[in-house]
């Protein structure tokens, strides 16, 4: 009996000392990992926010950076690896996604978007229908470009820093989908 109790205490002490194997932050029932690997870089979760459309919860978005920051302009101007990860809370069609991106480029990066027309058309061609609980990611690596992924599957790569600046402005620009989403992503 004493031996079993001693074993249980030792096991409990080991678990307590080791902590959680993978820390995460939670919002609206979605757990976002504290770190994300993009190429050979490890990015840290800068912040996460909730995208709502009218009264509907659409997705939880997480912003990942090499160097965390609360300054949207500095993040957009920096040529560091970065990613936005969106976990959807409802089904969203390709058409609905495209409409949201069109509006986002119009509101936040109109001039840059005009110069990046071909890259943006490629983005639109890559957008999938997204189901509830699926995760879509946009991961930028300097010198390589932005990889668009659904879950673990890469949908395509769009080269160029200028495209990445226009894309990330959708969430961090002057007119994001919602101020709460932007504030959350900025931590």
Question: What are the residue ranges of the model-derived segments?
Answer:
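N-terminal secretory signal peptides
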Residues: 23-77, 111
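Mid-length scaffold segments of soluble, non-membrane domains
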Residues: 68-143
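Short, solvent-exposed mixed-charge patches
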Residues: 186-187
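Flexible glycine-rich active-site/ligand-binding loops centered on an Asp-His dyad
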Residues: 155-181
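Bacterial N-terminal signal peptides that target proteins for export
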Residues: 1-8
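Short strand-turn-strand beta-turns centered on an Asx-Gly dipeptide
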Residues: 150-152
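C-terminal segment of classical bacterial N-terminal signal peptides
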Residues: 14-21
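Short polybasic amphipathic segments
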Residues: 34-36, 145-148
């Amino acid at each position: 009996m004493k031996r079993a109790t001693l074993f249980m205490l030792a096991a409990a002490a080991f678990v307590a000392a080791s902590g959680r194997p993978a820390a995460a932050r939670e919002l609206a029932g979605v757990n976002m990992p504290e770190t994300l690997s993009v190429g050979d870089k490890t990015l840290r979760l800068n912040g996460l926010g909730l995208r709502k459309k009218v009264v509907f919860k659409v997705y939880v978005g997480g912003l990942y950076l090499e160097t965390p920051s609360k300054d949207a302009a500095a993040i957009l101007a920096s040529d560091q690896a970065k990613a936005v990860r969106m976990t959807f809370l409802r089904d969203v069609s390709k058409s609905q996604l495209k409409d949201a991106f069109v509006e986002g480029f119009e509101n936040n990066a109109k001039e840059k978007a005009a110069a990046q027309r071909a890259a943006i058309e490629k983005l639109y061609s890559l957008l999938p229908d997204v189901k509830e609980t699926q995760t879509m990611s946009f991961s930028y690596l300097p010198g390589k470009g932005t990889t668009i992924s659904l879950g673990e599957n890469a949908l395509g790569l769009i080269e160029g820093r200028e495209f990445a600046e226009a894309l990330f402005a959708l969430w961090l620009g002057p007119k994001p989908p919602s101020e709460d989403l932007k504030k959350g992503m900025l931590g």
